[in-house]
Amino acid sequence: MPPKDSDSSTASGPRSKTTRPRAIRRLVIWYRRNAAVTSLVGSATNSASAAGNVAGTVVSSAGSVVSNAGSMAGSMLQPLVFDPLRRLQSSENNPEAEDIKNSDRLWVAVDGMGGDEAPGPILDGCLKAIQRLPLRIKFVGETEKVLGAVQAMGLTELFNQATAAGHLELVASGPSVGMDEEATVVRRKRDASINLTMDLVKKGEALAMYSAGNSGAMMASAIFRLGRLAGIDRPAIGALFPTKDPTQPVLVLDVGANMDCKPIYLHQFALLGNIYSRDVLQVARPRIGLLNIGEEECKGNDLAIRTHELLSEEHRLQFAGNCEGRDVLSGAFDVVVCDGFTGNVLLKFLESVGSVLLDVLRAELPRGRRGKVGSAFLRSNLKRIKKRLDHAEHGGALLLGVNGICVIGHGSSKALSVVSALRLAHSAASHGVMDDLAELQKAPVESA
């Protein structure tokens, strides 16, 4: 260590003798350690660089091989996997993506004047159905009102395209039957839209018909114009109810056509429902249930007890016994028969379940931030629940027992309900349900 310079020491001010040497020693130690670490890092870096060059060469060669193999595999697999996947995704996002052949389209007659707000929503639903389903539609209605609805709802372009393509045909009719008019008015208004719609089915110009109008007038017109099937005393209205299994609904009939029934009527309803469930819903052996207040054979009123005896002796169907109200939506039955009064009450009750359930859930969810977060997580689930319970998703009910496929819609039907109802009509027509229904013979027991 060099001797301390007195002049410099004086100039720099007083300083401790032990402080300066200790600081220098620490600096030297730090420098030596740093130099050693730097040397090690440098050699390691050089080695890593050399190894990286070698590995880079290998990886580059392997990468080119993998790239070439990937290109070959992609060219081979892409037409088999990715293209169909893209087509599937595009068709899901856009139902109109897949072209429908004209040869596959079936004629369906639509009562354009039937409904609370007809003809606007009915026409809107028909135009949407033409784009999504293999259908041609004969739209029966008062010409001026129909064309006015086209302008008012902004459907001019779609209407012109459908008519030009031959997918939509406007059939002029006279004054329609009002929603509040008596059913017998169809005898006086011979050129009403509901009567002309039935005539199209009777003449064979349409395979099915749909109306959201006066249900009593529709049933009367169907009986007068089409006639009842052989062996059927009273037609019945059959509606599809959701069950625990979203893919397998239950058919409930009658839901409003016959307020007072005899045992033989319910027996015939079971035969009609059995054929419809088998042909259209594709149930191999439909399980038939009789709506009652208990499972035991002795339960219920005189109508239920006598009907139970008839169904137990019927070999043309699989009778699964009495069905309590709690079992209707359980999935234990494929067809449930009842009188029209009870069935209509059950139908109207079910229509309210979806909205009431959502209202209860909204009321029970906590308010504030916790409620908003919980609602955000549950929103998609609640929408799916509402969709399964929404009567608009099922569209309509079938009038079974007449010589033609007739679908009855709700008076307040919107476009979605119309599309669903027309899908139901197309399904019944394409499965040839009328051929099997026409083969029904008179029920063996007539004294009941």
UniProtKB/Swiss-Prot annotation:
Residues 106-448 are annotated as: Phosphate acyltransferase. Coiled coil: none annotated. Its EC number is 2.3.1.274. One of its GO terms (cellular component) is cytoplasm. It catalyses: a fatty acyl-[ACP] + phosphate = an acyl phosphate + holo-[ACP]. Keywords: Cytoplasm, Lipid biosynthesis, Lipid metabolism, Phospholipid biosynthesis, Phospholipid metabolism, Transferase. Residues 1-105 are annotated as: Unknown. Its main location: cytoplasm. One of its GO terms (molecular function) is phosphate:acyl-[acyl carrier protein] acyltransferase activity. PANTHER family: FATTY ACID/PHOSPHOLIPID SYNTHESIS PROTEIN PLSX (PTHR30100), PHOSPHATE ACYLTRANSFERASE (PTHR30100:SF1). Homodimer. Probably interacts with PlsY. NCBIfam families: plsX, PRK13845.1. Belongs to the PlsX family. Catalyzes the reversible formation of acyl-phosphate (acyl-PO(4)) from acyl-[acyl-carrier-protein] (acyl-ACP). This enzyme utilizes acyl-ACP as fatty acyl donor, but not acyl-CoA. This is Phosphate acyltransferase. It comes from Prochlorococcus marinus (strain MIT 9313). The gene is plsX.
